[in-house]
Amino acid sequence: KGSMLTKMPGDLWQKFANLRLLYAYMWAHPGKKLLFMGQEWAPWREWGEGRELDWWLLQHAPHKGMQGLVRELNRLHRSLPALHARDCEPEGFRWIDADDAERSVFSWLRFRAKDDAPVAVATNFTPVARPGYRIGLPKAGRWQVLLDTSATRYGGSGPDTPATVTAESRPLH
């Protein structure tokens, strides 16, 4: 038992970073999404029927940032059919790299239809920044960065990721 935040390992900064990562991972992975009774702003206490939610936590930047992240995850989920249209079909998901255990970075693609542009997801499960980390995107050119859980607006330490990245036309994975 306990709130999602208290289940996260590490110090205060790591707890919030890990929870942001968990929520982004959950929203980007196939399957239906569920948060319960205030978990979108990372309360310290678990919900209880005998008291109100800890709304006052939204006065504090880390909790307000978490709420903003969940708002953005919901917006992306609604606006990008690749993130929800084929939740129950294997064709809606393809790993780019599930084997980088040394750096704890995993990447995958989500698809709405075979010929549609996919949504690429890269997750870093460590507190170590990975500048210049390369993943094998399926098409060369500019890709828009839609979300970075370490962005300062979500309570992360930044630096904020550039708005676009460029994929080169050379095999990687």
Language-model features, listed with the residues they occupy:
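Active-site clefts of carbohydrate-active enzymes
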Residues: 1-11
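Carbohydrate-interacting/catalytic domains
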Residues: 11-20, 25-35, 39-173
